[in-house]
């Protein structure tokens, strides 16, 4: 799977966050999400002191729950990175300017989702049954995190993704819940909290 990191081709940009940019990429006729994030040279050594490595640590553990979280396929530290992070918010201007001087970035490849809940709720009117399914799926993801002693610490409408499905139900522990056309998952784990951190 590490070939994905080296041989994927960028199709288009699909998202911009405070510190990273998300692209749709293609490898071996399959689509993935690639997150590129600039880091300082003192963040290049893996350590859960830094948010980027916390995100990778969290994603690796939660990859066994691909319906509730994004599966990470690979990650790669890049030297001489030419990525330019767009300014997402004036609040982050100083940090982005500081990072723009760095020559390092991290590239992570995740499974791709169809979109984020913010856009889904803006473009479609979800029924009460769809909202019930959304809440049940989100609570189950929170339960899984609690079971592994994690807190997401950054849940909002841009960090909840969805995937359209023809499956009628999704298994949440011992029960099956109707999907009503969508499977929801948490994304963006850079602020994850764990006792190990």
List the predicted regions and their residue ranges:
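Conserved kinase catalytic-core helix
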Residues: 124-153, 157-158
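ATP-binding glycine-rich phosphate-binding loop
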Residues: 2-28
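Activation of the activation-loop gatekeeper triad in protein kinase-fold domains
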Residues: 187-192
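ATP-binding glycine-rich loop module of kinase domains
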Residues: 21-81
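Conserved structural core of kinase catalytic domains
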Residues: 70-128
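Active-site Asp-x-Gly
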Residues: 194-197
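Catalytic-loop of the protein kinase fold
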Residues: 146-163, 167-177
């Amino acid at each position: 799977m590490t070939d994905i990191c080296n041989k994927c081709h960028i199709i288009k940009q699909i998202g911009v966050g405070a510190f990273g940019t998300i692209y749709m990429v293609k490898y071996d006729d399959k689509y993935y999400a690639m997150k590129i994030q600039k880091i300082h040279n003192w963040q290049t050594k893996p350590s859960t002191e830094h948010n980027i490595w916390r995100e990778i640590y969290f994603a690796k553990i939660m990859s066994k729950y691909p319906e509730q979280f994004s599966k990470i396929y690979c990650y790669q530290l890049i030297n001489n990175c030419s990525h330019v992070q767009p300014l997402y918010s004036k609040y982050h201007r100083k940090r982005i300017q500081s990072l723009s001087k760095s020559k390092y970035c991290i590239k992570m490849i995740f499974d791709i989702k169809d979109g984020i809940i913010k856009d889904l709720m803006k473009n479609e009117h979800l029924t009460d049954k769809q909202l019930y399914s959304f809440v049940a799926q989100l609570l189950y993801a929170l339960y899984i995190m609690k079971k592994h002693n994690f807190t997401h610490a950054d849940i909002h409408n841009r960090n909840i993704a969805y995937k359209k499905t023809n499956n009628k139900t999704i298994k949440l522990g011992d029960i099956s819940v109707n999907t009503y056309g969508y499977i929801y998952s948490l994304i963006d784990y850079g602020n994850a909290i764990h006792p190990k951190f």
